[in-house]
Amino acid sequence: MKLAYWMYAGPAHIGTLRIASSFKNVHAIMHAPLGDDYFNVMRSMLERERNFTPVTASIVDRNVLARGSQEKVVDNIVRKDREESPDLIVLTPTCTSSILQEDLQNFVERARQDAEGDVLLADVNHYRYNELQAADKTLYQIIKYYLDKAQRKGEIISEKTPKPSVNIIGITTLGFHNQHDRTELKRLMADLDIEVNEIIPEAASVDNLKNLPRAWFNLVPYREVGLMTAKYLESEFAMPYVDITPMGVVETARCIRKIQEVINPQGAAVDYEDFINEQTLHISQAAWFSRSIDCQNLTGKKAVVFGDNTHAAAMTKILAREMGIHVVLAGTYCKYDADWFREQVSEYCDEVLISDDNGAIGDAIARLEPAAIFGTQMERHVGKRLDIPCGVIAAPIHIQNFPLGYKPFLGYEGTNQIADLVYNSFTLGMEDHLLEIFGGHDTKEVITKGISADSDLNWNKEATAELQKIPGFVRGKVKRNTEKFARERSIGEITLEVMYAAKESVGA
């Protein structure tokens, strides 16, 4: 356990609550102390939800610590069952309930005797799983529970739909542009003449989960949530799955070709090559843009990419393959799936960083001095401090990345959105020169390119004036090299002589 200024992935119970509150008519009860119940406020604000978030906190207080939790938790489950009539109540453990070593499964068994709906314990280890792993496990658990139940009752319809059909797995509340991606994926499937059988968990009913085996295949657009479910459906019902994220022109085409490969042996006779060519050459603007003079201005510019596995890997490939941008570092905070990430990005970037320490990422950005960053909300803060533009491409995100307008990242419309984001994230050539000549609207002194600590060295007036004369795009590098030279020689104040000596020492 560590004290963190910033967490990229939240604790396990947040992942479980995201899944439970994505379903329709499912209620979650969280056994937690006051303070752990911020999920309701966060979801209502960020998703701009009109309905109340279906989560109740069963508060661990001094009475509970004195008398035990069973009575209170069971009463809360039965009361919510009576008041809300949900199809399912999910009891969510937290780190507190783990510390108290309470037998929550026993509480669930006890509550099932009095509740009309189903009651399920989210079986996630709070100290081993983070938000994303817990979301994946909880989704799998709910689907397995209902498919097992339907099998016992003989209600599963395993007969496939007449036309090719798909289950889209992993669209959740509080996901990065998930609601927009959902619409775009439905549109893409319609263009491919594929019916959408079920979308889970977002806005899905647990009563419809027994229909999942009717689909011809499963599509998992995000690696973080849904893969465990897809593997279970493959092993249990022989349902193939496609886990290629359709983000960017190349990967969208690869995803569509994989879908063709999966459905043709099942009786379809489709050839999507003409569709891919039409979309790539005429419908999507991204392929045309990547050959335009505007995009050629970006060729060779340096960028850093950081985020979850899905978005960071896809963005790295788009920048390197489709836009000719030099990715100096690609990173992810999904340490549990590091091998897959390395395999995906290693040929498209200079350096791979697997870390959930925001300080390490900030220092790497300061060291590399890219022209733009593509990351999470935290990298946006880092970019503001270093005066480097940042495009947000992955969660965690703030409210400006839950846009009211239509902004998918997947599919062919997603390629247009990404092209806009990339182009608008870089400071363009003429803008650079004008800022250099006129100083922009800002009269800041030298920007310190460091995150962990501010400079401990004193620059005298002449050296500072000389530093200001150096063009902005190399100023940070000159400043850093000079300070390194001074520290190595225990020089306390940087003068013009020190600057020139430092310049000679690096052979500039």
Swiss-Prot record:
Stretches assigned to coiled coil: none
Record's keyword terms, sorted: 4Fe-4S, ATP-binding, Chlorophyll biosynthesis, Iron, Iron-sulfur, Metal-binding, Nucleotide-binding, Oxidoreductase, Photosynthesis
EC main group: oxidoreductase
SUPFAM superfamilies in the record: Helical backbone' metal receptor (SSF53807)
Binding, substrate: G429, M430
E.C. number: 1.3.7.7
Keyword ATP-binding: yes
A GO BP entry: light-independent chlorophyll biosynthetic process
Pathways involved: Porphyrin-containing compound metabolism; chlorophyll biosynthesis (light-independent)
Catalysed reactions, semicolon-separated: chlorophyllide a + oxidized 2[4Fe-4S]-[ferredoxin] + 2 ADP + 2 phosphate = protochlorophyllide a + reduced 2[4Fe-4S]-[ferredoxin] + 2 ATP + 2 H2O
Binding site for [4Fe-4S] cluster: D36
GO molecular function: 4 iron, 4 sulfur cluster binding; ATP binding; metal ion binding; oxidoreductase activity, acting on iron-sulfur proteins as donors; oxidoreductase activity, acting on the CH-CH group of donors, iron-sulfur protein as acceptor
UniProt keyword annotation of tRNA-binding present: no
Any single Pfam family the record assigns to this protein: Oxidored_nitro
Transmembrane segments: none
Record's cofactor remark: Binds 1 [4Fe-4S] cluster per heterodimer. The cluster is bound at the heterodimer interface by residues from both subunits.
Active site: D294 (proton donor)
Assembly and oligomerization: Protochlorophyllide reductase is composed of three subunits; ChlL, ChlN and ChlB. Forms a heterotetramer of two ChlB and two ChlN subunits.
Family statement: Belongs to the ChlB/BchB/BchZ family.
Function statement: Component of the dark-operative protochlorophyllide reductase (DPOR) that uses Mg-ATP and reduced ferredoxin to reduce ring D of protochlorophyllide (Pchlide) to form chlorophyllide a (Chlide). This reaction is light-independent. The NB-protein (ChlN-ChlB) is the catalytic component of the complex.
PANTHER family: LIGHT-INDEPENDENT PROTOCHLOROPHYLLIDE REDUCTASE SUBUNIT B
Full protein name: Light-independent protochlorophyllide reductase subunit B
Source organism (scientific name): Microcystis aeruginosa (strain NIES-843 / IAM M-2473)
